[in-house]
A protein has these predicted regions:
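Non-catalytic connector elements of ABC transporters
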Residues: 3-8, 12-13, 265, 275-400
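Pre-Walker A (P-loop) beta-loop-beta motif of ABC nucleotide-binding domains
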Residues: 50-61
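Helix-to-loop junction immediately C-terminal to a conserved catalytic motif
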Residues: 78
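Conserved ABC transporter NBD signature motif
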Residues: 86-94
């Protein structure tokens, strides 16, 4: 390992013989190859048959809610929590049960983990010196890194004299100083305020692209994942829900969970009135193109549509009357909360509109307007709560 903090502990290291995975393993040339990884803590299974390949130079985000298994997977890659079964290969070398100090990675934690009694210079140099580098060469390399992270004048300061963002830059430089093959980031920005977080994530991306280092970042922040990652791994309850580019995750969620978790999504209860007509509330519209689903006549389901793919219009046949409940100003646009007319107990529908349109239409709470679906990027998912009206039992294909 290229960086080791003295307070890191290895947990649940199997005693005696290591469990063997006798399943045939496909040959992979990916930089990091994870196959059928399971991690159990007593009777609780934190990771369930996780398989994932990461290419050299990729920036990958593990995204999901608390308890989904993303940090456990990161710790398995680092050797801090060894898998119960499965295999992990880095650069075609088996590392599944190697101790952290024998692995090729640098790691940055949410808590910075800097030594408070050492200066910035000493914090970055400690790993270099531990590997036998001369004082002169170590200080020369530290100077280069301080220049790179914008802290050239802070070499003699102590961590307590730095802001949170500056401390995290030092932690990043320390992790990268030994030129590891893999950089692991465990929610490194979550303790910072919003403005610093935005600035630092840009710096991390620039540094990652400049170095070309394979990077994995754990986060629960959708915006971080969407703006930073080449690919996102969405996790839930110890399984991978979807792997894809930020655009794929946002525009083509593979499951209802992904659709709910990433961004804002409206789930509009609908039913098939006929083979060509959709019923929404008390209105009927022509059946739009649904990307992931072929509906059956009489079936009930939820139509998933982003707020930016809805619009409020003057009345026409393909629009649904709604009552505006609230307008939320979000700087670049308004988010308009609506309910279907005559169905005040139904879930609200959110529409994102340009400021100029809201002003031109003189929209205000209590107004009745008409909701229209923009063509494209419509998806469908099964209802969470079963309707009292039996749905059609014909074979209908959902994504999830």
């Amino acid at each position: 390992m290229t960086m080791h903090h003295p307070n890191l502990q290895q947990h649940d290291r199997p005693q005696g013989e290591r469990p063997q995975d006798n399943r045939p393993q496909a040959i992979s040339r990916s930089y990091l190859d994870i196959r059928h990884v399971v991690k159990q803590f007593g009777s609780f299974t934190a990771l369930k048959e996780i398989s994932l390949s990461i290419e050299k130079g990729e920036f990958v985000c593990f995204l999901g809610p608390s308890g989904c298994g993303k940090t456990t997977l990161l710790r398995a890659i680092a050797g801090l929590d060894l898998p119960t079964s499965g295999s992990i290969h880095q650069n075609q070398q088996a590392i599944t049960f190697l101790p952290p100090e024998q692995r090729d990675f640098g790691i940055v934690f949410q808590s910075y983990a800097l030594f408070p009694n050492l200066t910035v210079e000493e914090n970055i140099a400690i790993g270099l010196r531990n590997q036998g580098m001369s004082v002169r060469d170590a200080l020369e390399k530290v100077e280069q890194w301080l220049e790179m992270i914008g802290l050239a004048t802070s070499a003699q300061k102590y961590p307590s004299q730095l802001s949170g963002g500056q401390q995290q830059r030092v932690a990043l430089a320390r992790a990268l100083a030994l030129s590891p093959g893999l950089l692991l980031l465990d929610e490194p920005l979550s303790a910072l305020d919003a403005k610093v977080r935005t600035h630092l994530r840009e710096e991390i991306c620039q540094l990652q692209r400049k170095l070309g280092i394979t990077t994995i970042m754990v986060t629960h922040d959708q915006e971080e994942a969407l703006t930073m990652a080449d690919r996102i791994v969405v996790m839930n309850h110890g399984v991978i829900e979807q792997v894809g580019t930020p655009q794929e995750i946002y525009q083509k969620p593979a499951s209802r969970f992904v659709a709910e978790f990433v961004g804002t999504m409206n789930f509009i209860p609908v039913s098939m009135a006929s083979s060509q007509q959709l019923r929404i509330a008390e209105s009927f519209i022509a059946l739009p193109k649904i990307e992931n689903y072929t509906p059956c006549q009489g079936e009930q389901f939820d139509l998933a549509v982003r707020p930016e793919n809805l619009e409020l219009v003057t009345r026409y046949n393909e629009a649904i009357p709604v009552v505006i409940r609230h307008l939320e100003f979000l700087g670049a646009f308004y988010r308009v909360e609506c309910v279907f007319q005559g169905e005040r107990l139904a879930p609200p529908v959110y529409v994102d509109l340009p400021i100029t349109q809201v002003q031109t239409m003189h929209l205000k709470a209590g107004d009745v307007r008409y909701l229209a679906l923009r063509a494209g990027q419509l998806r469908a998912y099964r209802r969470k709560v079963m309707s009292t009206t039996p749905a059609a039992t014909a074979s209908c294909a959902y994504a999830a």
